[in-house]
Amino acid sequence: MSHPISVTILTKNSQKHLPACLEALQRFPEVIVLDNGSTDDTMAIATRFPNTRIVEHSFIGFGPLKNLAAQHATHPWILSIDSDEVLSRELADEILQLALSNPQQVYRFLRHNFYGKRHIKACGWDNDWVLRLYHKGTTRFADLPVHEYIQTKGLHVQNLQGTLRHFSFDSIAQLLDKLNQYTTLFAKENRFRKSSSPAKSCLKWAFSLFRNYVLQRGFLYGYEGLAIAFSNANGTFYKYMKLHEENQRLDISLIITTYNWKEALATVLKSAFRQSELPREIIVADDGSREDTRDVIEALAKESPVPVRHCWHPDTGFRLAEIRNKAIAMAGGEYMVMVDGDMVLHPDFLKSHRRMARKDQFIQGKRVLLSSETSQSLMNGQIDKITPFTAGIKNRFNAISSGTLSGLFSARKKDIKAVRGCNMAFWRADVVKVNGFNEDFVGWGREDSEFVIRLLNQGIARRNLKFGGVAYHLYHPENTRNGLNANDAILEKAIEEKSTFCPNGINRHLAANQH
């Protein structure tokens, strides 16, 4: 061995196979055992081997834990082994004789998987090549909670001849324990990244069972093959059902901006109270309204099924960007849905936003334009419900709310055309990443577009929500456009510089809220 190798092992209650695992590694100069909460004899077993060094850490996901173990290693070449795996003598000899002169090289070898003492060559357990030997200065494990892997982009992968024995499971009880753990991790990892449904879960279960038991020859291995095939299929079913369940839960803060139009705000707030899926809170972002607006908010808050918070600052001119930042900074939700105080919400408004939410995306919604007469009737309580056929609607297609149509026609866009903050949704973490709205904007216009430019440049995709997120825009005369030329200049600068961050943004409000 021209270069010493550090072996890393994750353990938790690993006493059964750990002695054989460590026995096969005695010729390696260092073995890092990273334990995350063993309550059996795992630690005592590890201390019996002079080349082992024990590190303890709570569970943070398999990928992050393996990278942490590598950080504790003395040597740059890392051999990552699981505590239920045993190197064959031939594989150990082969690894110890490698020159390891090229850090761009990574090595993999064949793993034989056992159920009890039986070598299983079916159900996807055969032809199992695992990549485990790498230079930690060149690559690392992907930071995934489950199904972690060594990143190999730009690296050369070399196969070794020796084999690794993997004592996967000894009983059906172990299969079920692992199934529950891994399906939960999968669901949390893919929450709002992948879609799922009960129908999809059932179809995937049926195909997985057929593939494992028939196509991958599980039927040749007796009850063990049947148990493994059903375990794999059930794992597929439950990971997608758990994902479906996770995707139903979104912690939404609804932010409503307002300025001195208490009648419209009252109508919007009442529509928020009637949502089929309620937010965790409603925050009124008030750009300096008079005291009568505060009175309306406080009175309606007593009727609200969720907390209503009033975020206000003095009226020193049109400072929409700043009051939005202040409201987002005080929000407790993970997901922000933002509307103007003249946008009356369809009962499924938040539900359709939740259905369309995806990590690394923001949502641009539309608005249904109402006539002056219809707007007044709605505020006076003369109209109880608006449909696409209600009189006084100027763009009726925008009034259609359908989960099926929304999923089919809500497309990604890469531009800032028709960006409107009056109906928009985004992850709070993404807002922080670009430092929120740019408070250099004073006066009406362009603060939404400049915010979106930075999101797009950060790799946050835009998705236009169609046939969902329906909101009815109450008619009013257009705002004055004083200051638009200066705001246009700020927007053009952000476009030219491909801006991803604004200095004058939300960070100071976040810091203030921490005190």
Please tell me what each predicted stretch does:
Residues 43-72, 294-322, 326, 330:
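Conserved donor nucleotide-binding strand/loop of the catalytic core
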Residues 4-6, 250-253, 281, 450:
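Cell-envelope/extracellular polymer assembly enzymes that use nucleotide-activated donors
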Residues 4, 63-70, 88-246, 321, ...:
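Catalytic-site signature of metal-activated, phosphate-bearing donor transferases
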